[in-house]
């Protein structure tokens, strides 16, 4: 799948599944219309991350959706993911691009216009901006005002995805402002029916 065709971007968090099978949740979300899956793991060993990444990659490959690894270039390369997402405190984008060449997508986090312009200049393929509605999955995430998000969208030419507390009830507030799409964690994974949640998100966003 091409980045420009993706509207719903799933960022994983096994805890958000609330006891449901992690891999089944991902597969159901993809069936509902998720176009990108980012595997985000902060507190597991490299070996466990690698093994988890292989399983998620297989699911993504079966459904022809993009597979992104959060932060870890080594894991992304080892499992031949489609790309890597880098936050402001991760490896510099220009260094990642030097290592990965043009074979991998590089996503970047930007919370204001200055950061957005900078990451675009450094070679990012897309931007994730938030937390637009606050979030329970990231402890240090500051809320991003809607006006600032709109400015970010108009300041760059690369696709922008909003993230942070987005669910089926508030996603409609983000349509028609120029976003490529939206990223969601618990707004998909914590729902009883992940497939239906994504279908509703798509319907309410379009």
PLM regions with names:
Residues 1-91, 97-126, 151, 157-158, ...:
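Conserved N-terminal beta1-alpha1 strand-loop-helix module at the mouth
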Residues 74, 147, 183:
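Active-site phosphate/pyrophosphate-handling residues
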Residues 76, 133-139:
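A short acidic, helix-capping loop that chelates divalent metal ions and anchors anionic groups
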Residues 138-150:
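Substrate-recognition "cap/lid" segment bordering the active-site pocket of phosphatases
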Residues 163, 185:
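Short hydrophobic "strand-cap" motifs at the C-terminus of beta-strands
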Residues 177, 181:
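C-terminal binding/interaction regions
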